[in-house]
């Protein structure tokens, strides 16, 4: 698991540590990543949506959860952005959802959703990730 909170930049030295292969998992795919995302646009000390998605894609965890939100974006709007990042075309997105999706660079489809109070994440010995909110989507 990798947890990246209250950050607006990751040095190449830190990326070198994050990118190292693991003895127990030579494929080096993290099961879970938790990535900072304060608001739609970046802040001096926090990622915005674009930066969070770019970091999540580089980490390439089986599941990525965003955390550290302000109040500008609703939970459901973050879910719509996460579904888009995963390759789903939004049906009837709101104008705000369209604006947030427009912030995201083109790139690899990954699983990404907002975290929330009470979220429980379980990782099995085999690396299967389940949670108490989104596992029904599979």
Show which residues each predicted segment covers.
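Conserved beta-strand hairpin/beta-sheet module of binuclear metal-dependent hydrolase folds
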Residues: 1-6
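Binuclear metal-ion centers of metallo-dependent hydrolases, dominated by the metallo-beta-lactamase
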Residues: 11-138
């Amino acid at each position: 698991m990798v947890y990246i909170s209250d950050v607006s930049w990751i040095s190449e030295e830190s990326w070198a540590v994050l990118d190292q292969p693991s003895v127990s998992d030579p494929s080096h795919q993290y099961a879970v990543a938790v990535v900072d995302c304060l608001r739609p646009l970046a802040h001096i000390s926090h990622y915005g949506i674009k930066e969070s998605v770019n970091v999540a894609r580089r980490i390439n965890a089986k599941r990525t959860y965003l955390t550290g939100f302000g109040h500008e974006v609703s939970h459901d709007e973050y879910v719509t952005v996460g579904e888009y990042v995963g390759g789903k075309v939004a049906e009837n997105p709101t104008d705000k959802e369209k604006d947030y999706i427009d912030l995201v660079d083109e790139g690899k489809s990954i699983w990404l959703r907002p975290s929330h109070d009470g979220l429980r994440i379980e990782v099995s010995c085999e690396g299967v990730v389940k949670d108490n909110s989104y596992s029904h989507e599979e």
